[in-house]
Structures are given as structure tokens and as C-alpha cells.
UniProtKB/Swiss-Prot annotation:
Residue segments, region Necessary for nuclear localization and DNA-binding: 1-25
Positions where Phosphoserine occurs in the chain: 19
UniProt xrefs under PROSITE patterns: PPIC_PPIASE_2 (PS50198)
Post-translational modification note: Phosphorylated. Phosphorylation occurs both in the nucleus and the cytoplasm. Phosphorylation at Ser-19 does not affect its PPIase activity but is required for nuclear localization, and the dephosphorylation is a prerequisite for the binding to DNA. The unphosphorylated form associates with the pre-rRNP complexes in the nucleus.
GO MF entry, a single one: DNA binding
Stated role: Involved as a ribosomal RNA processing factor in ribosome biogenesis. Binds to tightly bent AT-rich stretches of double-stranded DNA.
GO terms under cellular component: cytoplasm; nucleolus; nucleus; spindle
Underlying gene: PIN4
Segments for region (Disordered): 1-37
Protein name: Peptidyl-prolyl cis-trans isomerase NIMA-interacting 4
Amino acid sequence: MPPKGKSGSGKGGKGKAASGSESSEKKAQGPKGGGNAVKVRHILCEKHGKILEAMEKLKSGMKFNEVAAQYSEDKARQGGDLGWMTRGSMVGPFQEAAFALPISVLDKPVFTDPPVKTKFGYHIIMVEGRK
């Protein structure tokens, strides 16, 4: 009798362990999948005058990546694309602005106006995605 009871509880234990590991896997994925991240592009200029020129180009209808390639002093070859950035991986003012912006597209960007000042210089930021 006792061996049957043990094997019975053993099966139940295995079932619980399997479902337990599944839920722990979901928990492990939860923060990554639900973690706040934005797909960011920016134009970075050290000089305020240069960033204002870039802002005028954007307002005149130029695509964000083209303005970034022409004006940005960082990541210009990628059209200002910084890729996916998570909370805590950006400097304070940049992060606040990035998470406040709506998602937009290169030919009709919604960007920070006025530019955001950080220790790196002045940024015009746009967001292409959020997850």
C-alpha cells in the first residue's frame, strides 16, 4: 500500500513540477517581453545652432534618417538608428523624452521640439516602435 501512495504522489509531484517550471519560464519571459523598450532614432549635435538647422530640415519635410545622416554627429551612417533601448539604458532627459513620444515613421516623424539637452549635446529624438 505505501509504495502505491508514494508513486501516486510522485506522479502528482512531477505534474506539479512541470507546471511549476512552465510558470517560472513565463515569469522569466514576462519582464523581458513586457519590459519597457522603445526603438529610437536620434540626431545628435554638440552645437545648438546645428541642431536647430536639422530641426528646420525636418519641419520642411525631409525624412528623419536623411537629416540624421547629414547632421548627426553620432550614428549618422545608420540614419540615427539606435535600435531597441530599454529603461535605464539611456541618460535621464533622453529617456524621459523617448518614452513620452508617440510611435511615428521616417517620412512623417513626430520628434522632440525643442531638442533635448544631455551631457552629449542636443538631441532630436523620434520613436519607431515600442514593446
